[in-house]
């Protein structure tokens, strides 16, 4: 899906409704949560007459330094007069509390996203910019263009999304505009130390989890990968979402693609693809997933498919190497 819509379109829809319900995606991360709560805080501060709801569950993520006080789902009568907003996601099966969307009660829906994938949302307007490093960067753009008042809470949430999805401003889609908008947050009440210290904080249990993942490290061809089953995750006192850490093994010399395979409670296995060049999205799409060129994901049913995915990734490395030589 090509870039579509604009901040003006998003602003028009947000201005139009006095009741707004904001969703995040399943297996939440810093970008979807930062975008969701950043937008809620910005709207509440700048439009105090509006009722703005953030629904879902952060699954304990980032609660050590930021507050995620989710709202109750409004009544059906309220939903009928509301704008539903999906940030950082597209398909309903990727959206937390999709059952609310499945009712098709919203007057309209708005999608704010940087993933180049089609959606199946009802009565939807889309603002999609694939080159953005994070959906939170788009929320920052909206705040900048609308000259909204930015509280410390709002700035911290939005900065969380930008920092985590950009890998601390290291990933390839980080742009001059990313830095300009981060600077704008610095000028408008951001507490960067709170965010960075919160993200850096670890525990003995975290170190044990990292050790378990590192002990599973394998290589095949030019692909490095780690994997862990659900039983081992629980034995470590963790939940599956805590163990999705592909960048632990990122950028090992000679391995331009790195993967993590993480079994969830359902028995399904979450696959995270990362690279510093090859287009891993091609492999993710083959396996029913999607995402960005160098950061994608999919779900598989069995660890028996691990070697097949690794083989596909090695083929993608070879294809990429041929391209850069031409």
Positions of predicted regions on the chain:
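Glycine-rich, phosphate-binding/catalytic loops in enzymes
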Residues: 38-40, 101-104, 127-128, 180
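Short N-terminal binding/cap micro-motifs at the start of the first secondary-structure element
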Residues: 29-33
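An acidic intrinsically disordered interaction segment
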Residues: 1-9, 101-110, 131-135, 139
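Short alpha-helices
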Residues: 114-181
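Short glycine-rich anion-binding loops that position phosphate/pyrophosphate groups of nucleotides
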Residues: 27-28, 89-92, 115-117, 230-233, ...
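Active-site cofactor/cluster-binding pocket
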Residues: 64-125
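Hydrophobic helix-and-loop "lid/oligomerization" segment in the mid-to-C-terminal part
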Residues: 2-24, 34-65, 74-82, 164-286, ...
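Generic enzyme active-site microenvironment
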Residues: 23, 27, 86, 111, ...
């Amino acid at each position: 899906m090509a870039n579509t819509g604009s901040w003006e379109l998003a602003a028009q829809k947000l201005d139009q409704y006095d009741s707004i319900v904001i969703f995040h995606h399943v297996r939440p991360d810093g970008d979807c949560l930062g975008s969701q709560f950043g937008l809620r805080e910005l709207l509440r501060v700048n439009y105090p007459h509006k009722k703005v709801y953030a629904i879902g569950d952060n699954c304990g993520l980032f609660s050590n330094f930021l507050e995620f006080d989710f709202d109750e789902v409004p009544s059906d009568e309220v939903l009928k007069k509301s704008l539903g907003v999906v940030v950082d996601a597209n398909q309903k099966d990727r959206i937390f509390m999709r059952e609310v969307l499945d009712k098709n009660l919203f007057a309209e829906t708005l999608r704010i996203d940087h993933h180049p994938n089609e959606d199946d949302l009802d009565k939807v307007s889309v603002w999609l910019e694939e080159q953005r490093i994070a959906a939170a960067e788009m929320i920052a753009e909206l705040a900048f263009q609308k000259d909204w008042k930015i509280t410390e809470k709002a700035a911290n949430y939005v900065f969380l999304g930008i920092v985590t999805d950009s890998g601390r401003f290291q990933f390839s889609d980080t742009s001059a505009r990313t830095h300009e908008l981060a600077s704008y947050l610095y000028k408008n009440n951001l507490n960067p130390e709170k965010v960075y210290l919160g993200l850096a904080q670890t525990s003995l249990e975290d170190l044990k989890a990292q050790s378990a993942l590192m002990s599973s490290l394998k290589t095949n061809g030019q692909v490095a990968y780690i994997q862990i089953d659900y039983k081992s995750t629980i034995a470590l006192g963790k939940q599956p979402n805590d163990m999705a850490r592909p960048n632990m093994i990122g950028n090992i010399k000679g391995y331009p693609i790195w993967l993590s395979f993480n079994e969830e409670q359902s028995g399904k296995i979450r696959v995270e693809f990362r690279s510093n060049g090859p287009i891993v999205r091609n492999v993710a799409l083959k396996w029913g997933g999607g995402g960005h060129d160098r950061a994608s994901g999919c779900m598989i049913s069995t660890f028996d498919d691990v070697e097949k995915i690794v083989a596909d990734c090695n083929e993608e490395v070879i294809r990429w190497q041929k391209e850069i030589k031409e």
